[in-house]
């Protein structure tokens, strides 16, 4: 743990524009306050979690919670205005450290503006952009405006060295602190092994993702049922998506049990035998929970064309990348069809070689993702504090 003299008030400027980044930012703020006490001040951009830790956001992050090229194009004037606002505020604050959290299309533009106007401000990038999957040249460019990358995935430091990027340290994924909420107790394990098996369907956490996946997922599950495969279907979602999910389910040939909220989602993970999931962070959650899966991804045609031309990794599935082998089947764009998904689901529900390969790989995940005795936020705080100037004025 890094020791820091607390005779001067340290100013940390943080920028997080998505809910996941907001949670990371809040945990980092708590850890820094534990270390520095009253000798730290926070400014920047964040959501509700960071607000509970005392941050007054420059603007509501909901205005930036968008996905997809068409959505970005529609909101471009707002995005550009907020980039200018955040960069100007960071320069005015003259913080001891600027911490940008995820959302690279936004936060990196802010960081570049800040570095160009005041190179003395250390900049930490918490959550690496996916340079290992596409646009790898970004890593080398980041050296110009990022002093240290805090990686959530254990393979990322090696990728930054290979790509000649800035210093990068694995600080741990927040999921490693939530293992108990994802894994079954003995009673839940009995349900996981019982008939009919519980099958999770996870179509995404954004409106555009749900629109792209719900129809084909419903068709695939209908085919699976028509083939005589028995299962109990559970669809976890969040309150703000409940109405959209309900509307899409009107067109499904079978009806899942819909559970709402993070706690009920975790409870469903603990009893599930298998899952059909849109690729993303949820695949890593499933791997940590020990739930074999079939993964899929569909996007708009323009976005898919651009991504396909630039993708460089052997897999886009986080679970596969972390365990180092392609154990979870992934069906992207035109490969994401109802018959293909149904056939793979039939396999993963049964005691098949596909299922056994996944379970064996997921059994190694604790060792792969371990950070020892320290929490991810503690590891992150060590690096942030290590970048503080040796001496600072009481207030800037």
From Swiss-Prot:
Bilayer-spanning residue ranges: none
EC numbers, comma separated: 2.4.1.182
Domain of life from the UniProt record: Bacteria
Single Gene Ontology BP annotation: lipid A biosynthetic process
This protein's record includes keyword Glycosyltransferase: yes
Keywords attached to this entry: Glycosyltransferase, Lipid A biosynthesis, Lipid biosynthesis, Lipid metabolism, Transferase
Molecular-function GO terms, alphabetical: lipid-A-disaccharide synthase activity; phospholipid binding
GO CC list: membrane
Pathway in which this enzyme or protein is active: Bacterial outer membrane biogenesis; LPS lipid A biosynthesis
Recorded catalytic activity of this chain's protein: a lipid X + a UDP-2-N,3-O-bis[(3R)-3-hydroxyacyl]-alpha-D-glucosamine = a lipid A disaccharide + UDP + H(+)
Similarity comment text for this entry: Belongs to the LpxB family.
Its biological purpose: Condensation of UDP-2,3-diacylglucosamine and 2,3-diacylglucosamine-1-phosphate to form lipid A disaccharide, a precursor of lipid A, a phosphorylated glycolipid that anchors the lipopolysaccharide to the outer membrane of the cell.
NCBIfam families, alphabetized: lpxB
Protein name (Swiss-Prot/TrEMBL): Lipid-A-disaccharide synthase
Species of the source: Rhodopseudomonas palustris (strain BisB18)
């Amino acid at each position: 743990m890094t020791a820091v003299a607390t005779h001067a008030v340290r100013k940390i400027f943080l920028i997080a524009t998505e809910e996941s980044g907001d949670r990371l930012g809040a945990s980092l703020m708590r850890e820094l306050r534990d270390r520095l006490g009253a000798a730290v001040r926070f400014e920047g951009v964040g959501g509700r979690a960071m607000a509970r830790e005392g941050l007054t956001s420059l603007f509501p992050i909901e205005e930036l919670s968008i996905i997809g090229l068409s959505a970005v194009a529609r909101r471009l004037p707002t995005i550009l205005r907020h980039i200018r606002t955040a960069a100007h505020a960071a320069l005015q604050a003259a913080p001891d450290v600027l911490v940008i959290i995820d959302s690279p299309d936004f936060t990196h533009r802010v960081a570049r503006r800040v570095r160009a106007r005041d190179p003395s401000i250390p900049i930490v990038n918490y959550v690496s952009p996916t340079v290992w999957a596409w646009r790898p040249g970004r890593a080398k460019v980041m050296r110009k405006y990022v002093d240290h990358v805090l990686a959530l995935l254990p393979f990322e430091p090696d990728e930054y060295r290979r790509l000649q990027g800035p210093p990068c340290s694995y600080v741990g994924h927040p999921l490693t602190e939530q293992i108990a909420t994802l894994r079954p107790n003995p009673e839940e394990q009995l349900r996981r092994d019982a008939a009919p098996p519980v099958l999770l369907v996870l179509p995404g956490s954004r409106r555009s993702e749900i629109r792209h996946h719900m129809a084909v997922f419903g068709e695939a599950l209908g085919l699976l049922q028509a083939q005589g495969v028995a299962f109990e279907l559970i669809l976890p979602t969040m309150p703000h998506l409940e109405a959209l999910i309900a509307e899409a389910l009107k067109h499904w040939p079978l009806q899942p049990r819909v559970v709402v909220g993070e706690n009920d989602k975790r409870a469903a993970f603990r009893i599930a035998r298998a899952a059909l999931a849109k690729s993303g962070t949820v695949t890593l959650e499933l791997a940590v929970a020990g739930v074999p899966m079939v993964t899929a991804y569909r996007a708009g045609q323009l976005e898919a064309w651009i991504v396909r031309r630039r993708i460089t990794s052997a897999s886009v599935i986080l679970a596969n990348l972390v365990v180092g082998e392609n154990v979870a089947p992934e069906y992207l764009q035109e490969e994401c069809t109802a018959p293909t998904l149904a056939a793979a689901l039939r396999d993963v529900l049964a005691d098949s070689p596909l299922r056994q390969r996944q379970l064996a790989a997921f059994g190694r995940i604790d060792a792969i993702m371990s950070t020892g005795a320290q929490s991810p936020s503690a590891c992150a705080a060590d690096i942030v504090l290590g970048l503080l100037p040796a001496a600072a004025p009481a207030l800037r």
